[in-house]
Amino acid sequence: MDMIFKDTECLLFDMDGVILDNTYDNNFWQNQIPSVLAKKRQISFEDAKRLAIQIFNYKKNSKDWYDLDYWSNMLDIDIEKQKKAKESYEKIRLYEGSISCLEKLKGKMKMILITNAHRKTLNIKLQKYDLSPYFDEMVCAHELHYVKEDVQLWYMLRSRYRIDFEKTVLIDDTIKNIYMGLSAGISKAIYLGNEKYASSNKILSMSSINDVPSAFN
């Protein structure tokens, strides 16, 4: 482990599924929006959910998938307002140990949050848990015109923020994002996802964010 992360100068942190759990987002798109859509179109919740899934899947892994303004226009629903609603907002939750992890790593190297979340979504989450003191930059992939599943995003990130990828570690819960980052030149990665994935010479698989600081001791 010490060999893998020797000379790390920059950490790229994902947010959802790494620092925050996915309850908020999953419930919002799978339950709250179909419920609003059902009332708006006077159809059953089940029909609204099927319709929503069909519409959402059409844009999966694209820039529009994460764009609140796009979905507000597409569904004729104020998505930002719905995301701020109490029944949704209260579901924003930190993973246990995430703040402790950030506190242990802050100051040891440059820390950058890189998320697919729209800036409006990020701001809502930061209102509940202000993560900004732990990061040198908080970057929304949307504003670089790509998503993390696209290798071009990583090239844009490297250029915009002058990151030395040879001394950078990416922490993410989506293996495709990790592969794209590595293919763009990122040296190493920590995978915190649910899929079973064996560690390699470039990717260290961990079960919890609590374990991350030990990789940099």
Predicted features along the sequence, with ranges:
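Hydrophobic residues in well-ordered beta-strands that form the structural core
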Residues: 21, 113-115, 191
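Substrate-recognition element of Asp-dependent hydrolases with the DxDx(T/V) motif
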Residues: 11, 79-93, 98-129, 139-141
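N-terminal helical cap/lid subdomain that shapes the substrate entry/recognition surface
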Residues: 4-100
